[in-house]
């Protein structure tokens, strides 16, 4: 028998009725003999022929809390908005048109069912009344301008290499006031715990190890990111990266930002160290991909920029350039695969 319990963690704990002549007495802080929702769930889990699922708000319990409260007696199932493949399976039609809508509005299931204008209002409300409210309630915060502004900064700079210091400096330039790095790191942790953002760490493609404090942040849903910015026209490259990152994570890949150093000559003939970047280094078992994501590479300068890191990498990892154009998968003269984003998401990975 399937049994779903939604928001049971919001119920109040009571004193053990054996100590209160069977009466239900609300537990107070410090009471030892209490019965909480955890006890109820564990009791139900011991019943035969019950497949038990517990859902609810992040304001009361985060995924990290599940491990603490239930120890080895529960499995955490990560749920996410619809991937592009799931979204396209539902809406059908032109893959390119579906991608355009998906970049704007994301894959929140209820948003998908609504007309465009209602999608905008729904996603704005979802961000404020669910995601932000959960952060404030779970961490006993007062809704503050600093929390708001930091979320705006991460939204605007999604897909850029960031650390707490860079974000604090941006905050200072925007708000004309200081915020310490510890507060920035704490708030970033809140955003991650509430499943607003995920992070991609830098990975040295030659040293084969994660490096440094710089990392990129991507929204778990592009619609939520755009709602945060009032649906101002997004940077196409950033949003494409976000979609590709999410799809790779959905498909079980470990995803990092690839980087490596080379020594080059500047215009004065002096040797300088230069850091090169590959948008993503994605691995899953024996599958390994370098992935560059671009809106378009028909311009010679853009093409040269995207393939330059690949010309400097002499290894056997599959090298891909994913573009937002309906092109057939092809190999260029250097052996790199060029593929349209919809084919990459729907057929390749």
Q: Language-model segments: what does each one mean?
A:
Residues 1-34:
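Conserved P-loop NTPase "ATPase switch" module shared by AAA+ and STAND
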Residues 29-34, 43-66, 191:
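Sensor-1/coupling segment of RecA-like P-loop NTPase cores
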Residues 48-49, 57-161, 165:
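Interdomain motor-coupling "hinge/lid" segment immediately C-terminal to the ATP-binding subdomain
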Residues 57-61, 322-329:
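Short, polar loop motifs at secondary-structure junctions
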Residues 116-288:
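Accessory nucleic acid-recognition modules appended to NTPase machines
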Residues 283-299, 306:
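Active-site ExK catalytic segment of metal-dependent nucleases
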Residues 297-326:
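Basic, amphipathic alpha-helical patches used to engage nucleic acids or provide basic targeting signals
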Residues 325-349:
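Domain-level recognition of nuclease-like catalytic cores that cleave nucleotide substrates
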């Amino acid at each position: 028998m399937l049994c779903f319990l939604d928001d049971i963690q919001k119920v109040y704990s009571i004193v053990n009725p054996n100590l209160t002549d069977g009466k239900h007495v609300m537990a107070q802080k410090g009471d030892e003999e209490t019965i909480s929702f955890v006890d109820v769930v564990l009791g139900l889990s011991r019943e035969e022929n019950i497949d038990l699922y517990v859902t609810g708000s992040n304001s009361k319990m985060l995924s990290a809390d599940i491990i603490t409260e239930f120890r080895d007696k529960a499995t955490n199932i990560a749920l996410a908005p619809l991937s592009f493949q799931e979204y396209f399976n539902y809406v059908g039609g032109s893959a390119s048109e579906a991608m355009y809508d998906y970049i704007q509005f994301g894959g929140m299931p209820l948003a998908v069912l609504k007309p465009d204008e209602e999608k905008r209002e729904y996603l704005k409300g979802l961000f404020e009344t669910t995601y932000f409210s959960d952060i404030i309630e779970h961490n006993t915060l007062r809704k503050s301008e600093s929390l708001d502004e930091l979320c705006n900064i991460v939204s605007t700079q999604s897909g850029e290499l960031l650390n707490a210091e860079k974000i604090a400096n941006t905050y200072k330039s925007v708000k004309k006031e200081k915020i310490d790095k510890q507060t920035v790191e704490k708030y970033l942790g809140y955003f991650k715990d509430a499943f607003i953002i995920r992070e991609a760490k830098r990975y040295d493609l030659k040293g084969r190890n994660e490096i440094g404090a710089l990392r990129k942040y991507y929204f778990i849903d592009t619609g939520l990111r755009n709602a945060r910015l009032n649906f101002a026209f997004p940077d196409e490259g950033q949003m494409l990266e976000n979609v590709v990152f999410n799809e790779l994570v959905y498909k079980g890949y470990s995803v990092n930002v690839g980087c490596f150093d080379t020594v080059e000559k500047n215009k004065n003939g002096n040797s300088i160290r230069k850091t090169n970047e590959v948008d993503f280094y994605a691995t899953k078992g024996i599958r390994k991909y370098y992935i560059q994501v671009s809106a378009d590479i028909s311009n010679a300068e853009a093409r040269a920029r995207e393939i330059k890191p690949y010309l400097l990498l002499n290894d056997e990892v599959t090298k891909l350039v994913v573009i937002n154009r309906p092109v057939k998968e092809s190999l260029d003269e250097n052996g790199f695969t060029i593929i349209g984003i919809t084919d990459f998401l729907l057929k390749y990975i």
